[in-house]
């Protein structure tokens, strides 16, 4: 339990390596393949359930691993009503124990895309509500911590950014983020680093 704090470490405080775009696409496709093979949304699954058999044959998982993978997909589908993929993005909103609103966008695009998307959304929300908010991103989605007074129809979250303005919004967000200065210094240090001796010279 985060006790009112952001649920994960904000991504600009400790950037971890993100999944590649290719791996993110394959993970999302695997989830989609499992979801399409579901016959019954009830757990526990019988050993002969179609997605379990498929995972054992195609992905070389053992029985328990295949069942856990399918149960993971079932649990998410039970809560969200669908399985988030790169073709089906799900927005979810709930109030935490402290009364703050959490907006979660389930989008398995990988950390690189989700960090950029999260920064741009954070900037848009800050401008729209005149309120500094926390954002965190993972390989599987984005979390925005909003106040209890910030209300909007959930489906409008996808209209906060569009292809015409996203570059400008993201540029403004990155320039104001501590991540920009940290990365700038890191890159400048690496660019100026000279080896003392190379081949005896």
Residues covered by each model-derived region:
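C-terminal effector modules of nucleic-acid-centric enzymes and ribosome-associated factors
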Residues: 1-201
């Amino acid at each position: 339990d985060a006790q009112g704090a952001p649920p994960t470490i904000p991504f600009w405080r400790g950037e971890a390596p993100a999944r590649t775009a290719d791996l993110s696409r394959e993970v999302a496709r695997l989830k989609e393949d499992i979801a399409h093979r579901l016959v019954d949304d009830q757990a526990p699954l019988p050993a002969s359930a179609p997605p379990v058999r498929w995972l054992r044959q195609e992905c070389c998982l053992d029985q328990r691993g295949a069942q856990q993978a399918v149960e993971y997909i079932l649990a998410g589908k039970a809560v969200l009503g669908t399985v988030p993929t790169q073709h089906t993005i799900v927005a979810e909103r709930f109030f935490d124990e402290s009364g703050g609103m959490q907006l979660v966008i389930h989008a398995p695009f990988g950390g690189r895309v989700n960090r950029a998307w999260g920064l741009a959304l954070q900037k848009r929300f800050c401008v729209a509500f005149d309120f500094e908010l926390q954002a965190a991103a993972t390989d599987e989605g984005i979390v925005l911590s909003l106040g209890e007074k910030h209300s909007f129809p959930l489906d409008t979250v996808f209209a906060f950014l569009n292809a015409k303005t996203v570059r400008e919004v993201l540029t403004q967000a990155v320039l104001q983020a501590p991540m920009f200065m940290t990365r700038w210094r890191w890159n400048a240090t690496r660019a100026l680093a000279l080896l003392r001796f190379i081949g005896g010279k």
